[in-house]
């Protein structure tokens, strides 16, 4: 509170002028290590009521920097400009209160310029961030909401190993195949798939209903990129804008997935 209220520079000497503590006391305490993840966890535990529905969210944020010597300075994607620019990037893991539609930051890590080895990409860095800090998530959180960049086999399978399920977006050109549900022939290999799902063609999708002016359609399909069967939810808005989200087909209902994904997008 002192840092917010004091006038002038935020120095130990200035802090001591506005409190009963001495400059040396501030110096000693600021020299001690603080577990910020545990600090944030305790704060989130007090803020979000235990009865509220919660999910986790992971996303990266671009920070503009013009220096040359700053650690971690490199080219990262800037969503405001829709292109890669020089700067810094941080990966943020948050807990989302669905009832209040509010996200609370739990953990933040700076994205390194290069991966630890040649076989890894930045997706591995994001996954490593989640694996190392997911222990601080509330025990009733089992879903992680992400955008389309995280919809990759490496990330999805890594989450499943940790016991979490991903709710993410898919590209408009995602390679999806309908599952064959008809009668199999007595001889030969059984037919597994029944044609490709064309984004925009809702003739073979099941209509779920409408939520906040968005029509929901769903289907159980095979995703070639993720190499697994998933539930997709096709969102069609009044302005004809569309989006596709997904989850493991055994764990989520279409309406629930749209609400959870919409909580992050709004």
Set out the residue ranges of the language-model regions.
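Single, function-defining residue in the core of a domain
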Residues: 6-8, 19, 51, 65, ...
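Active-site-proximal, Lys/Arg-enriched surface segment
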Residues: 31-101, 211-222
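Gly/serine-rich nucleotide phosphate-binding loop at the start of the catalytic core
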Residues: 1-35
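Short, mixed-charge, low-aromatic patches
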Residues: 1-2, 81-87, 253, 257-258
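A common structural microfeature
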Residues: 9-12, 23, 52-57, 90, ...
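Exposed alpha-helical structural elements
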Residues: 11-14, 25, 38-43, 175, ...
